[in-house]
Amino acid sequence: MAKDIGIDLGTANVLIYVEGQGIALNEPSVVAIDVKTDKVLAIGSDAYKWIDRGNQDIRVVRPLKDGVISDFDATEAMLTTFVNQLRVKGWMSRPNIMVCAPTNITEIERKAIIQAAQSAGGTNVYLEYEPKVAAVGAGLDIFDFVGSMVIDIGGGTSDIAVLSGGDIVTSRSLRMAGDQLTQDIIRYLRLQFGILIGMPMAERIKQDVGSSLQVTNPIEMTIRGQDLNDANSVKGLPKQVTIDSNDIEEAMHATLNTIVRSAKEILGEIQPGLAGDIIDRGIMLTGGGALLGSKVKGGGIDSLLQQELHVPVNISESPLDNVAKGAGTLLEYAKRERHNSHQILGIGNPSYKKKLDQETQIESNNIHINKVEN
């Protein structure tokens, strides 16, 4: 018998939750392709090793950008490989799959995700909004008629939402998150230190010494890259410099400020009763970005948000796993409570349900978005 799965199809990583097992796969969203033949050579962590290696015969692709598919063929190959690897298909059955997406996803982007998941082996494929699923994975009761606020900072998008009664009350989706912060670091070091580094090194810097605030005791780190200064008439020679957490905060400041500003706007849009709930319960912070600054005393992104929003901020227990876990949990819940499944998958009122039924059913009668058939 097939096992249902929940997929966090992230810009940086793919996580898959398997029914009865929990998180069974966590791999980089990377595909390595032979330039001459267009053949897929490696996927996931095996492909990630080729980033910045300078091999002209191999093209390294990150098939998702800003939380949505940018290379359909590579995404399809990647998902198919991962699903087959988990052996979730039955002898004569295929799994139900829930995939998560940003709240500002377009109709074309929705269809691409659904089709990729179907090609990977899904029978009924569902799409749900990421902050809603992240909230479930973080342990929040989204069906309670109490206000909850979630900030989910992933690789490609930052999704901010207020939820109550099983629905999203208001939300923002910024195509500005972990990957943008990594690019900010690369750009800053190029301009301020005259050194060129690649994505893997920038990721290490972000994780090890990154800070969301200027701190009294920054952590230092010595890094190596290519010299971009031409004082000796020779560019590209190896170069070593020492940086610290306050340098990295300066590099990331503008992007972090945009996320904070959007969170303030969300809080300004909600009713006083919901605002009171959020003050009492705090904001739940999820996604890989929730760990930013966690190694620097006083530099965590939770501290930044709490300082700027004047609301308690809590980091979920397993922020990297919340979306995949929440997707799997919703599918399992839907199977147990099928009479209430429309609410589970986000159809909160008749007009919204009608709109989804009209706009999002595609190609095959058994492929739907935000819809479980009774």
Residue ranges and their predicted role:
Residues 1-153, 161-283, 290-374:
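Nucleotide/phosphate-binding catalytic cleft detector across ATP-hydrolyzing
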